[in-house]
Amino acid sequence: MKTFIHLLSVLILSVVLYACNNAHFLKEENYRNQVTEDFEQKKQALPHGDLFTVFSNPDLSVYEQEALMFLYAYMPIGDVTDYSGDYYLENVRLSGQTRTEMPWGDQIPDELFRHFVLPIRVNNENLDDSRRVFYGELKDRVKHLSMKDAILEVNHWCHEKVVYRPSDARTSSPLASVKTAYGRCGEESTFTVAALRSVGIPARQVYTPRWAHTDDNHAWVEAWADGQWYFFGACEPEPVLNLGWFNAPASRGMLMHTKVFGRYTGPEEIMLETPNYTEINVIDNYAPTAKATVTVTDTEGHPVSGAKVEFKIYNYAEFYTVATKYTDAEGKAFLTAGKGDMLVWASRDGKFGYAKLSFGKEDALKLSLDKKEGESYTLPMDIVPPVEGANLPEVTPEQRAENDHRMAQEDSIRNAYVATMMTDEQAKEWVNGLYGNILQPETMKDKLAAFLVASRGNHQTLKDFLSAIRKEKKHISWEEMRGMWLLENISAKDLRDVTLDVLNDHLKNTSDGEKTDTDLVKRALLNPRIANEMLTPYKKVLYDAISEAVLKSAPVDAAHDAKALIEWCRKEIKIDNELNSQQIPVSPMGVWKSRVADEKSRDIFFVAAARSIGIPAWIDEVTGKVQYASDGLSPQDVNFETSQSTQPRTGMLKASYTPIRSLSDPKYYSHFTISKFKNGTFQLLNYDEGDVDMGGGATWSNLLKNGVKLDEGYYMMVTGTRLASGAVLSNTTFFTIEPDKTTTVDLVMRESKDQVQ
């Protein structure tokens, strides 16, 4: 009898396993066919590099094959080239595990699981092994809870790990945020979404790209439970859902949206569909809204189809694009937004037109493409944001007291980990122990100690790097000096997540630059940092590969080699911006392997390749132009369209300013910005604190009073006075910069006689 029962159990288990292995991940046939078609197109677009070998695994079940197919069909280019198929297979299996091990696994609709649990990517972060790590830490903590309580509990766990602190624009991976113990709101929300997905709870990052009433932005989290979406502040636990410090400002928001992985057909308004994601509008969850339709015509009144329509919010002294749509056959595009003012900008074939649109007051706007490059004029505009109307859920005093108590406990847990990081005293002691009195001046010791402190939980990587290059005991070697310069030139965030193989590759495989310590060599040759990409090792491999495949010899003449590299990039790298619609940088090795990139990743690749063969190269931080230097010549602009490099033709811009009360020296981003015309729209010039040697960033007095060089072209300057109500008095000036000439404009800060500024 026991034998029979055992055999029956084995048979039942076999049947279950067979059924599971042959169950569809994509259960709806029409959707499965669409994904299959998209996947085949992706394979055709990326024919090089053996990027799809995981599908040759004979052990893949039908479920696993379809889940992988869904991921690969909609991944950005870099996710295909820079991570292995085995990595994605592990994550498919881990996500499937939550459906059987978590009590809510069978409650989640397939569509929500597909788009909000399975995907690893949340936004533009570096991918890591957080799903496996987080599941191991969280599963026993939440498996006996309801879904809503589990969401709250995961957020408490996140607060144990990470708190808010501003940082640069590159988004840390979830595990890097844990190692650092802090992150900006975009990193906190990326981390929290990853944590929720790790235990099988559908989650998404929601963000307002710009507030309308104040110069800032914010990102938070929505999670799904029991049939609906709830919001909360990432790493900011509250006693209940739908509560955060941002309830009030969100009620004044004009747009909240999220990027959903793949083709998504949920109930929300679709703002944009790309080969990678579907962007949806969730503003209705937070604020009163209104819908408006924009009709774009030519100068004769005929509708223009395919026109680009940008919806812009005034913020940080620019009109920032928060939504982009394209007109249909009738020349129409629509948007649902909070009840305030936006600037609507339409363009097609180099022509453009614009007007203010007041959502809630106007439900239609007609725009004529009647503007063209070269016209000089000034346009004042009053911008009014939505009014506040927050709706706060009830919290009892007991709930608040319990939540405060838990947050204090979580602070102590996190602070205990932070205490394992190096203090200034410990770092200085370690540096002294390594170098004694040999390293001079003392300021260099202080710098190294500061790097160790700034590296937070990554300090062992820096210690291993510095210890390994400390070979000469009686003096500082050339390699050691270069190692110190390398650490000087990477960002503070890089110090927190850089790996030893990256540091070693860039130290050991960078040309000596004739053993000079010029700023150019440090900044544009030795430096691993190019733009906002994750740092990777590539110099040794690219030096060998480019020498053989591009130059046909070892690098000899920088000017000749640069031209050969430009020509190779033009001919051999296929540009496909749509396949990388978020512009998440593809690694230099990923571009080399696939021969496919978006323009931004192509630019990063060129700089990486040039540095690998000893040519100083960079992407200009203000204009975004790719440049290089050779043979002591002035910087050369790279033009991949013609394979030519040229010296930029520049003119001078000066601005006069008559001070208004309480504002003697307007600041860039706070009071004014400058943008350059390109392809029917204007692109911001990114001046920042590092560009002007005045300590406080770019201002009228140190940028425009005596003049600043700009490339020839058509520009606009936006100024704005923010009133206490959140409204803005803006002024936009259009002007042209001609080569070797000075253009003078007025920087006008408008004032209100009636309202508080």
Q: Which ranges hold each PLM region?
A:
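Secondary-structure boundary elements
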Residues: 27-180, 216, 399-401, 407-594
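Hydrophobic/aromatic-rich core segments of domains that either
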Residues: 140-146, 150-156, 165-175, 180-272, ...
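Short, ordered, surface-exposed loop/turn motifs in non-cytosolic proteins
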Residues: 291, 299-318, 339-341, 561, ...
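Structured interaction patches on ligand/partner-binding surfaces of diverse proteins
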Residues: 350-372, 722-753
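C-terminal motif of bacterial Sec signal peptides marking the signal peptidase cleavage site
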Residues: 18-19
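Short, acidic Ser/Thr/Gly-rich low-complexity loop/linker segments typical of extracellular
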Residues: 315-336, 680-704
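A short, amphipathic beta-strand motif
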Residues: 290-301, 331, 651-663, 754-757
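Compositionally biased low-complexity segments at domain edges in trafficked proteins
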Residues: 370-430, 658-660, 746-757
